[in-house]
Amino acid sequence: MRIYLIGLVAKILGIIIPLLLGVAFLVLAERKVMASMQRRKGPNVVGILGLLQPLADGLKLMIKEPILPSSANIFIFLMAPVLTFTLALCAWAVIPFDYGMVFSDLNIGVLYLFAISSLGVYGIITAGWASNSKYAFLGALRSAAQMVSYEVSIGLLLISVILCAGSCNFSEIVLAQTRIWFVFPLFPVFLMFFISCLAETNRAPFDLPEAEAELVAGYNVEYSSMGFALFFLGEYANMILMSSLCTLLFLGGWLPILDIPIFQVIPGSIWFSIKVLFFLFVYIWVRAAFPRYRYDQLMRLGWKVFLPLSLAWVVFVSGVLVAFEWLP
């Protein structure tokens, strides 16, 4: 029993510690890449080439005074960022980094991840409501509407992938892409899924809940110190999670780019990391290149474009698989 508990704790720490380090350096990478795209230098003072900037930012947030609004519901106000960050961590339980390298290899891994991601809206909307601020509440309402709208499309797009793979288990979905990655036969599904992931994680050009010009900072406007830091960590952890999800569903997870001996020597976890880093770069590139959508444009895209198209793709994929007897 003791050995089992030690192994369990080691597995949990093996996910949490690299994830927190990844989030810290993702923030630095984002600032560096955006600075390069905008012909600036970016952080370059703290440490060599600014590599210690995440540590300095973390220490700054830790030693700041947590300010609690006098009219806020204190308990819910404090629990909302904890809920957001906890859900962001729980989702990683079913993500395989290599064959067999997964915390819990569930047969319903896709459904588990979809359920956890849909719960993330509660942390945001309770934060906006408990703050008792009109800016925070409007930001939370926008975020809730945005996340719920695009979750419907994400769910239907996931069905197309599940039909092709014949399983809800992430490891089996990756192994189903041994001959060809799903990004090629399902390219429109991949595009819609990635754009929906941008909206689901409240990233540019869909970062309407945090629209600085009109809502100051959105749902976390009243947060400071570690409350703000937990929301920040949760957002970037979800970015890495969605990049991992795109990698598993469409780019073959840990499978090498080409099935040749020299590529098979490289560990699968390295291939997985390279693909995730590619998607993270695209996240940053989109933020630097595209302007923010209006709220009505965002809702129209979700309900009038992506929802009918994703439903049509489910019908089309089902028809093709049945007609050619390709059902797994």
Curated annotation (Swiss-Prot):
The keyword Repressor does not apply. Its EC number is 7.1.1.2. It is found in: Mitochondrion inner membrane. GO terms for molecular function: NADH dehydrogenase (ubiquinone) activity. The chain crosses the membrane at residues 8-28, 74-94, 108-128, 154-174, 180-200, 213-233, 240-260, 265-285, 305-325. It catalyses: a ubiquinone + NADH + 5 H(+)(in) = a ubiquinol + NAD(+) + 4 H(+)(out). Keywords: Electron transport, Membrane, Mitochondrion, Mitochondrion inner membrane, NAD, Respiratory chain, Translocase, Transmembrane, Transmembrane helix, Transport, Ubiquinone. PANTHER family: NADH DEHYDROGENASE SUBUNIT 1, NADH-UBIQUINONE OXIDOREDUCTASE CHAIN 1. Belongs to the complex I subunit 1 family. It comes from Marchantia polymorpha (Common liverwort). InterPro entries: NADH_UbQ_OxRdtase_su1/FPO (IPR001694), NADH_UbQ_OxRdtase_su1_CS (IPR018086). This is NADH-ubiquinone oxidoreductase chain 1. Core subunit of the mitochondrial membrane respiratory chain NADH dehydrogenase (Complex I) that is believed to belong to the minimal assembly required for catalysis. Complex I functions in the transfer of electrons from NADH to the respiratory chain. The immediate electron acceptor for the enzyme is believed to be ubiquinone. It is an enzyme of class 7 (translocase). It is a multi-pass membrane protein. Its main location: mitochondrion. GO terms for cellular component: mitochondrial inner membrane. The keyword Transmembrane applies. Pfam families: NADHdh.
